[in-house]
């Protein structure tokens, strides 16, 4: 297996962080912190583009399985859409992926499921998501209440789920494969889901979009982002899972953790600190 990208070995599974690139954003999207204070944190972290949000996908290989967690932004982002190139770099073609696990259905997570002609990219894969996620995006009442951008997102989700209708499956709380368990992490979206991989004394949690700006939201877990469907629930979930990650000494992976892909989390003051070197 290629080691061009950050990876961790948990039992029989090798988990590789594959960058999809970045998406342009703004610190104005954050609530619960002054923009200037958020900027200081980003600058102190040495980030060249402090408002950009990095996008990761994760490849899980082992026990005869090739599982992808999220599909990135695909052609929807002029600074993203690098997943397929990076899959090829580690020797994986889209047809070799047997399962795509979706943390949720925002465009930077499902955009890579369809090619520019709106055809399925992963034609042999099962697509798995939380049933509450599908219910949310297929709810006509919620669609009618959404703003223009939101309605475009609803349209994208519906188009994507329809394209994969024959291969669509829902989590039922059981292991996806022995040692891989879905973890419901609601708030960012109703069906937002992480994936826990356990083996021996090691535990890795791919926590999806618990944070978008990791340095800011670990130090200040009360900070929410405009993309959160239920900011209060997202904050509650973030605090709970960060505390659990500390107490259980989990290794963390996340779609917006940055190029390093993996981090450990520690308590610090009234919040937490992510370390990319101590894992």
What is each stretch, according to the model?
Residues 20-21, 71-74, 105, 133, ...:
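Active-site metal-binding loops of divalent metal-dependent hydrolases
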Residues 78-128:
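Active-site metal-binding motif and surrounding structural segment of the metallo-beta-lactamase
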Residues 81, 88-89, 123-184, 233-249:
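Metallo-beta-lactamase
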Residues 100-110, 185-192, 253-260:
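Histidine-centered catalytic micro-motifs
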């Amino acid at each position: 297996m290629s080691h061009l990208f950050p990876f961790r070995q948990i039992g029989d599974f090798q988990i590789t962080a594959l960058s999809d690139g970045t998406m342009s954003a703004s610190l104005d999207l954050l609530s619960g912190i002054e923009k200037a204070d958020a900027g200081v944190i980003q600058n102190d972290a040495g980030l060249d583009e402090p408002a950009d949000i990095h996008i990761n996908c994760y490849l899980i290989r082992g026990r005869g399985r090739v599982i992808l967690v999220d599909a990135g932004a695909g052609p929807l982002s002029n600074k993203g859409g690098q997943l397929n190139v990076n899959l090829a770099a580690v020797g994986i073609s889209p047809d070799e992926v047997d399962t795509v696990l979706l943390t949720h259905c925002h465009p930077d997570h499902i955009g890579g499921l369809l090619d520019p002609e709106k055809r399925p990219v992963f034609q042999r894969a099962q697509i798995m998501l939380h049933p509450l996620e599908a219910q949310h995006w297929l709810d006509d009442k919620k669609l009618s209440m959404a703003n223009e951008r939101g309605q475009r997102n609803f349209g994208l989700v519906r188009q994507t789920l329809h394209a994969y209708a024959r291969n669509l499956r829902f989590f039922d709380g059981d292991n996806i494969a022995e040692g891989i368990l879905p973890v419901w992490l609601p708030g960012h979206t109703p069906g937002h889901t992480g994936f826990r991989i356990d083996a021996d004394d090691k535990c890795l949690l791919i926590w999806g979009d618990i944070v978008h700006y990791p340095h800011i939201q670990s130090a200040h877990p009360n900070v929410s982002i405009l993309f959160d469907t239920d900011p209060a629930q997202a904050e509650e979930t973030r605090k709970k899972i960060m505390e659990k990650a500390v107490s259980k000494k989990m290794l963390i992976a996340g779609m917006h953790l940055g190029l390093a892909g993996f981090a450990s989390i520690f308590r610090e003051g009234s919040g937490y600190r992510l370390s990319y070197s101590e894992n």
